[in-house]
Amino acid sequence: MAGKTLYDKLWDDHVVTQRDDGSCLLYIDRHLLHEVTSPQAFEGLQLAGRQPWRLSANVATPDHNVPTSKKERDQGIAGIEDDTSRIQVQTLDDNCKAFYIVEFGINDIRQGIVHVVGPEQGLTLPGMTVVCGDSHTATHGAFGCLAHGIGTSEVEHVLATQCLVQKKSKNMLVRVDGVLGKGVTPKDVVLAIIGKIGTAGGTGYAIEFGGQVFRDMSIEGRMTVCNMAIEAGARVGMVAVDDKTIEYVKGRSYAPKGEQWEQAVAYWNTLHSDDDAVFDAVVELNGAEIEPQVSWGTSPEMVIPVSKAVPTLEQAKDDVQRNDWTRAYQYMGLNAGQALADIQLDRVFIGSCTNSRIEDIRAAAEVVKGRKVAPSIKQAMIVPGSGLVKQQAEKEGLDKIFLEAGFEWREPGCSMCLAMNADKLQPGEHCASTSNRNFEGRQGNGGRTHLVSPAMAAAAAIAGHFVDVRSF
């Protein structure tokens, strides 16, 4: 009998019962909530007269709709100008109080993007099943978790039962060996993976990221990669537990202590795929060949190394891709064969659940230090992923580096990743963004998004256009 993959182990450890149709009822260890996908779920509980099944499993924080300017933030919920956004944040507050659920409110130092806050607080622990009403919940798989997004009706189901009916995915291994070159980051790795397999490449699979590159990678880097497993078509992305994982978790607020810690570590050390485990699909990349990446189109798979030009229709693999590229040229205002350096940028956004942790901010600051934002850039903003990330960055003096260079230093939240708050692109504007999606209108109606790493975004802000950060 073949060994088990990490995904197999996590799945099997959480099966409550298997149903006749092959689906399983899974136990959920951690449920993270935010203001956008939870109101209807809480309303469903109220209408049915139910209470959350296990209060301690649930933790909430507002992130999508919160303002990131200090003036608005200082006013708390009252500072949210948009009526719908304000009501959603207030409703989360009200529901958490009514149901006795822990919430890191809008001006709590622990508030932030839910996928930054969970690991930061030790709410995300190896071996857990973690769900949230947000597609980028795969982020938490960096800790050897089975983590994925759920819909609003499922949010209610988890609140009420602490269980969820799921169908098991197939297993995919994405192995990246070798050593990354200077200026090549985890964001570049995951963009290169998506560029190779496409946004449907992982559909129906749980992806395990393995190989030397991921063994060498920091935990925050692994979070960046797992965050974008969803853009590769998978619902789940994960990395095996190792000493780095355990060290990162140790001492965090919600991490186990004393004898429970020792017991947990003994279990966590089993959370890796067996040597004889068989995967349904294997994808391999050479890390030494990966360059800094820039997305040029309207899908994360429309991505190229910074040294390349916008592809021509002759390079498309089929008619579907030719049609997609033609539409992307038009929406993005680009020409086939155009050099990336010729794209005039308007804004730069460094933040999001993909790249707003302290390592990301340090990487950007290293590029920015002693330089100035180009006069042609209308706005360059740094949005830390949580109040604690912001606090740590300020302790290190990183905020001063950015402010002296002409960046805006913002309050934590999802910000310009998506057009659900005050931070938006205007029609036709090009933005170098460290977020995870470059769909039409994602950052604002008519906005044009280019996905890059924090270092590449910082370099673009200084130059006013895309440059190879390796030359900085």
From Swiss-Prot:
The keyword Amino-acid biosynthesis applies. It holds the Pfam family Aconitase. It is an enzyme of class 4 (lyase). Its EC number is 4.2.1.33. One of its GO terms (biological process) is L-leucine biosynthetic process. One of its GO terms (molecular function) is metal ion binding. It catalyses: (2R,3S)-3-isopropylmalate = (2S)-2-isopropylmalate. Keywords: 4Fe-4S, Amino-acid biosynthesis, Branched-chain amino acid biosynthesis, Iron, Iron-sulfur, Leucine biosynthesis, Lyase, Metal-binding. Binds 1 [4Fe-4S] cluster per subunit. InterPro entries: 3-IsopropMal_deHydase_lsu (IPR004430), Acnase/IPM_dHydase_lsu_aba_1/3 (IPR015931), Acoase/IPM_deHydtase_lsu_aba (IPR001030), Aconitase_4Fe-4S_BS (IPR018136), Aconitase_4Fe-4S_dom (IPR036008), IPM_dehydratase_rel_enz (IPR050067), IPMI_cat (IPR033941). Heterodimer of LeuC and LeuD. NCBIfam families: leuC (TIGR00170), PRK05478.1 (NF004016), PRK12466.1 (NF009116). Belongs to the aconitase/IPM isomerase family. LeuC type 1 subfamily. Catalyzes the isomerization between 2-isopropylmalate and 3-isopropylmalate, via the formation of 2-isopropylmaleate. This is 3-isopropylmalate dehydratase large subunit. It comes from Acinetobacter baumannii (strain AB0057).
